[in-house]
Amino acid sequence: MSNKKLILKLFICSTIFITFVFALHDKRVVAASSVNELENWSKWMQPIPDNIPLARISIPGTHDSGTFKLQNPIKQVWGMTQEYDFRYQMDHGARIFDIRGRLTDDNTIVLHHGPLYLYVTLHEFINEAKQFLKDNPSETIIMSLKKEYEDMKGAEGSFSSTFEKNYFVDPIFLKTEGNIKLGDARGKIVLLKRYSGSNESGGYNNFYWPDNETFTTTVNQNVNVTVQDKYKVNYDEKVKSIKDTMDETMNNSEDLNHLYINFTSLSSGGTAWNSPYYYASYINPEIANDIKQKNPTRVGWVIQDYINEKWSPLLYQEVIRANKSLIKE
């Protein structure tokens, strides 16, 4: 009788142990699978919990996102910062888009880089973003909008009123503010307003954006924002500014109410040897390698020139991988 009881106890214990081992294995498989989902670049936001603020997520973006249609070699040296279209940028992980516009005489907004017309309209960008979000509803698109050049003669109204009456009314735009969480932003375009005269709420408002500086400001009442946007400096100063801001971001990784925006772009000197492309070919892999070596839990919003697959390690991929700490096991 005692032998039977002993055998029964051993059987029960072994069953419990095997169940525990399989449960632990399944948990690890699920966790590993979730982390691996970060590397599906068109859907990398999917495994990140809904309650995480966008300000806390490390997000890659593109500087002067609409310059990819420039064909003239001289204009390319001066003004081209992206070689691939919006959908390519989105499919390769970019979720922040630096959109700069001009109001036309038919009261539409077209994209500009300084005085350069980019042969792209704001409608084109919004439609591309809508299609991408329809295909990938787990994602969000952050659209930074700035008035880049004086209105055309004959334009009626203002840049801000035209945008808000003719574009922002689209339900694709998130109309809430505050410290926006990913769950509220999925499937939406989140507006970051770099233009003045706004009468509408929604997105990130009231930006004070001094030129060629690193600065800290407050938006949406209680969200602190540090921006590094030095673009008219020498190469060494630029790289130092990027790394200093990134180090501050890493050291402040648990502050959910502080957003860090870090531009890696440098303005053109007018030749092939000091063009945005030339600078990006060195800066992008250097910053990517710095992230890879430090293995941080947060690097902020990193806005780059020339998102592509040319210069290893790839900056946008290292930025996205910094989010692995946000994925719950």
Swiss-Prot record:
The keyword Lipid metabolism applies. Its EC number is 4.6.1.13. It is an enzyme of class 4 (lyase). Cleaves glycosylphosphatidylinositol (GPI) and phosphatidylinositol (PI) anchors but not PI phosphates. One of its GO terms (cellular component) is extracellular region. The lineage of its organism: Bacteria, Bacillati, Bacillota, Bacilli, Bacillales. Residues 51-194 form the PI-PLC X-box domain. Gene3D superfamilies: Phosphatidylinositol (PI) phosphodiesterase (3.20.20.190). The active site is at residues 63, 113. One of its GO terms (biological process) is lipid catabolic process. PROSITE patterns: PIPLC_X_DOMAIN (PS50007). It is found in: Secreted. GO terms for molecular function: phosphatidylinositol diacylglycerol-lyase activity; phosphoric diester hydrolase activity. SUPFAM superfamilies: PLC-like phosphodiesterases. Keywords: Lipid degradation, Lipid metabolism, Lyase, Secreted, Signal. Residues 1-31 form the signal peptide. CDD domains: PI-PLCc. It catalyses: a 1,2-diacyl-sn-glycero-3-phospho-(1D-myo-inositol) = 1D-myo-inositol 1,2-cyclic phosphate + a 1,2-diacyl-sn-glycerol. This is 1-phosphatidylinositol phosphodiesterase. Coiled coil: none annotated.
